[in-house]
């Protein structure tokens, strides 16, 4: 499959996801990933579609794959935190959330050396 075809499948997956068609979105993400198996944007989308469809174990599996590919991706850790929380695994959710906060802080330090460190888990107001 060409990279252009993979991009088309990815765009279709985004559309389906936006329409709440999670199963079909996952199928389109799978097609996109056939050409580019390490495409983290598509993996992120697939994980979200799995989670929104109630398939939290699959979402966690894909989230872990993203972390394997890019351990410094704060969004991957944030997503894993959310997936664990939805599954009721609060301790794991907090661990991943802490990793995400620390990675985001390190990125902020590159732009703002005086940025304060992140607070402990639960120190931010989260709207669900």
Regions found by a protein language model. Name each.
Residues 4-31, 35:
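Alpha-helical segment of the N-proximal tetratricopeptide repeat
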Residues 1-8, 112, 125-127:
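TPR-adjacent "capping" and linker segments in tetratricopeptide-repeat scaffold/adaptor proteins
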